[in-house]
């Protein structure tokens, strides 16, 4: 089970663009929490606290405990609006999760032992990570903070597909149920010369058009 992280929030009394603008000037982020059998609730969060939290991977992929005056609700981050050029978070959406209902979430992929693998030891091999995250379905208690992929045995020319990822108990990748064409490559270990030839072929095709 992934570690949970508590974030203290307050109920937001005033709504609208003017009220939200005043909150942001005061170092506060307007937000909303929705979902489940409860009504949506307008809340506000400390900008400094969230700015630090959002620099961590867990903020985007873990269950968060929203503490509203002692009332703790488990949520997932669903949307975060940022200012186009300032270091400013404009608004956040959180969705409540139910312990007995499966949820869909994006989970980061962590690749380990690449350098010590046969492919990683070769200076002539290019290892590419085609995916850095994957969409999963599971109960909240089973949601992993990340999924680890061990590349220690990765050989030259090998391809690791989505179906080959070792998943934690209770976790599924729904895309794999859509057919073999959705079993996409996650890691490719390609000989550098092969990649160079591919680039040359693409360039030649472009010149021919």
Swiss-Prot record:
Keyword set for this entry? Ribonucleoprotein, Ribosomal protein, RNA-binding, rRNA-binding
Which Gene Ontology biological process is one annotated for this entry?
translation
| Gene3D superfamilies to which the protein is assigned, alphabetical | Ribosomal protein L25, beta domain, Ribosomal Protein L25, Chain P
NCBIfam families noted in UniProt: bL25_bact_ctc, PRK05618.1-2, PRK05618.1-5, PRK05943.1
Q: What quaternary structure, including any partners, is listed in this protein's UniProt entry?
A: Part of the 50S ribosomal subunit; part of the 5S rRNA/L5/L18/L25 subcomplex. Contacts the 5S rRNA. Binds to the 5S rRNA independently of L5 and L18.
The job of this chain, per UniProt, is described as: This is one of the proteins that binds to the 5S RNA in the ribosome where it forms part of the central protuberance.
Q: What is this protein called?
A: Large ribosomal subunit protein bL25
Which gene codes for it? Answer: rplY
